[in-house]
A protein has these predicted regions:
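N-terminal acidic leader/helix
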Residues: 2-23
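Compositionally biased, intrinsically disordered low-complexity segments
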Residues: 10-12, 25, 51, 65-66
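Acidic, low-complexity, intrinsically disordered interaction modules
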Residues: 18-61
Length: 68
């Protein structure tokens, strides 16, 4: 499971719909999450723009944990 809150919440919701977290990519302030549809075996993407996080501290935490 992902460590930071926004991704954790998204992951939990998508898991309820039959998706499994695979990977992420952070580029130019956009966090793209990759999921596998466990029913059909397809890979889907979800984009989260971290610039929308209001807290600078939370943004820094998102970057730090994604880079681990």
């Amino acid at each position: 499971m992902c460590k930071f809150q926004a991704v954790k919440i998204a992951s939990e919701k998508l898991r309820e719909l039959g998706y499994k977290y695979i990977d992420h990519n952070l580029k130019d302030g956009e966090l793209t999450l990759f999921y596998e549809n466990m029913m059909y075996g397809t890979t889907d993407k979800m984009l989260i723009n971290y610039r929308y996080f209001t807290s600078e501290r939370l943004r820094a935490k998102v970057i730090e944990e994604v880079m681990e």
